[in-house]
Swiss-Prot record:
Organism whose genome encodes this protein: Danio rerio
GO CC annotation, single: cytoplasm
Name of encoding gene: klhl41a
The BTB domain, residue ranges: 32-102
Upper lineage: Eukaryota, Metazoa, Chordata, Craniata, Vertebrata
PANTHER family: KELCH PROTEIN, KELCH-LIKE PROTEIN 41
Annotated knockout phenotype: Morphants exhibit leaner bodies, smaller eyes, and pericardial edema. At 3 dpf morphants show reduced birefringence in axial skeletal muscles suggesting disorganized skeletal muscle structure.
Function, as annotated: Involved in skeletal muscle development and differentiation.
Protein name: Kelch-like protein 41a
Amino acid sequence: MEPMSVKEDLRLFQSTLLQDGLKELLKENKFVDCILKVGDRSLPCHRLIMAACSPYFRELYFTEDGTEKKDANKEVVLENVDPNIMDMIVNYLYSADIDITDDNVQDVFAVANKFQIPSVFTVCVNYLQNKLSLGNCLAIFRMGLVLNCPRLAVSARDFIAEHFETLSKDEEFLEFNAPEFFAIIGCDALNVEKEELVFELLMKWVRKNKENRAKALGDAFEHIRFRLLPEKYLKEKVEKDDIIKADPELIKKLKVIKDAFAGKLPQIKEGEKEGEGENELPGFLNDSQRLGMFNRDLILMINDTAAVAYDANENECFLAAMAEQIPRNHVSITSKKNLLYVAGGLFVDEENKDSPLQCYFYQMDPHSPNWIALPPMPSPRCLFAMGEFENLLFAVAGKDLQSNESLDSVLCYDVDKMKWLETKKLPLRIHGHSVISQNGLVYCIGGKTDENKTINKMFAYNHKKSEWKELAAMKTPRSMFGATVHKGKIVVVGGVNEDGLLSSCEAYDFGTNKWEVFAEFAQERSSVNVLSVDGVLYAVAGFTIKENEDKQCVPSEITDIWQYEEDKKQWSGMIGEMRYASGASCVSMRLNVAKMPKL
């Protein structure tokens, strides 16, 4: 055993022994030399324990020079305290056990703060930090400030900053006083993509109590980053605001801001020390971007090692999350709410003798680089595809992992209820198809039947009517192809059919219900990932046929990235080899590059 481990065991043993002994002495009423009078209750305890755990009680029993007060009363009267709460705290000091709940945490916190009992105070802080939610974070932020607990206030502020766009719509936000409000809107960590939202919330807050709050606008200006606003917005919305126009001091500040837009910053006063950095300019000229302004539309590649985000504009890669638990050959989907779900894959649980084949289901945590395990799919399958409608995710058809037969069943996952159900079956059994979600419908395109016949059919599912409707068929039957919605049309790329690999592409017009020829891909390829990112169409990785060392033609994985050039109507190669694309599914997702390590 390591020396440190031995020391830790000895310390823990001694602490437990001491705690149990003190608890026994209290229970047997031995050496009791203090009575806490709380309301109609009398709580026996030991001075030694109370003084050791609380500076408040230490002052009752000792003078400033540390001499024990001989005349200190045995009975200590505690005013305006709930006796049940104080009893809980005293028991905690002897047992290290306390039942903190949503109902009592505020009262326990207040009493621990009043009598300076840091151990109980810390327990409450930990509890509240773990309980932070959209419903309570504003109140917890205020509590942290009122009780002078920076750790809690900062945790709550950071939570508010992360969910700023949602919480800014809450009327409670407008009840903050000026220092509370400014502490939030001045935060670098605000998850806001446009400074306009911060300014508009400020003016809404002012107008809530115009008579008193208009006077605080001068200070409030220090927390708005006007240089991050579009110049047109500054002229039309800020300068023309009636409250701002009526204040001469604000007009002067706007003049300085307009000069800054023109490239003229105020001169640094003589005598100021060099290197003061951000203190050189007034706050309203701060042009540091908020955290949310680092959000970008990225190509996210998920394989059984990691989820890596690629910024095609900057040619940079970022680690979104490690992904050792994600099986190969899974299916991924990004919802309209920008949430990533990963389902299926080839995984055999050898310890589960009854059901060794598993179809796991994960969501990437939007606030941390972790995966959240969700209820697994009830019927293990592969070669299926996923779509969505409102708060529902659909796993359409595929191949049963046990029987190896194609399926027509459609599984439906309710995101709110966290439950899988089965919905209206597809009109035929297929696998290797693609699914697209658009205009409130789920489109199932192409695929292959158990008779090894590739199809060109397309069906649209209306969940409200619980019906599948056949629409215009593709010009070319295909399976194992890429598909996405780009500029209002479905674009399909490559795939395979009875004639072999395909390089042909097609586009579907929702308005006319017609397919048209799209620019041919540069290479015959199957299993290609096709995605539209920030208005640009990309094709990532896939399989083609290559000649090996033995001069045999075999399937070979390609990990390149192609971009479609709209003006030239052709595909152009961007990257010859993207190692993170190997074995990966790819989706378009908006992520914050400031929160991810750069690779």
